[in-house]
Amino acid sequence: MSLGGGGGGGAMEQIQQQLQALEQEKQAIQAEIENVRDEQSEIDEAIEAIETLETGATVQVPLGGDAYVRATIEDMDEVVVTLGGGYAAERDSEGAVESLERKKETLDDRIEELEGEIETVEEETASLEEKAQQAQQQQMQQLQQMQQEDE
């Protein structure tokens, strides 16, 4: 008789492990969404800078390691924009903004994709929670049957 109860407990334990794995997956996806949103914010800042800075303006240029140097913009007519894959291209201000806007659109698509993944994980979670509830009800019924048999 204890085999039936133990099997149910094992099923519950397996379901709990699957639920934990799904929760971790959901958290990882949410973290990736935050990273993508941060990247979008950086793009917005770059677009704003391109649109507002003028030749002769003084800016702080990051050197890395939280070190900056003051620099004077000599020419806002040409902006270097990364294209991906380690490549960059020189564009006029308008072309640079267009390039950055396309990057943002790609990131929007990625966010939609990730939100779809979260939806799938949530559906799987709901399904597992339903299975857990059913397994728990089965365990309760088995326990009640064992108690009735003992009486």
Curated annotation (Swiss-Prot):
Main location as per UniProt: cytoplasm
GO MF, any single term: unfolded protein binding
Lineage: Archaea, Methanobacteriati, Methanobacteriota, Stenosarchaea group, Halobacteria
PANTHER family the UniProt entry points to: PREFOLDIN SUBUNIT 5
Subunit-structure text: Heterohexamer of two alpha and four beta subunits.
HAMAP family assigned to the protein according to its UniProt record, in alphabetical order: PfdA
Membership in a protein family: Belongs to the prefoldin subunit alpha family.
Gene Ontology CC terms: cytoplasm; prefoldin complex
Compositionally biased region (Low complexity): 133-151
Protein name, as recorded: Prefoldin subunit alpha
Residue ranges of the region described as Disordered: 120-151
Function, in words: Molecular chaperone capable of stabilizing a range of proteins. Seems to fulfill an ATP-independent, HSP70-like function in archaeal de novo protein folding.
Cited NCBIfam families: prefoldin subunit alpha (TIGR00293)
Pfam families, A to Z: Prefoldin
One BP term from GO: protein folding
UniProt feature coiled coil, ranges: none
Keyword entries, A-Z: Chaperone, Cytoplasm
Keyword Zinc-finger tagged: no
Compartment(s) of residence: Cytoplasm
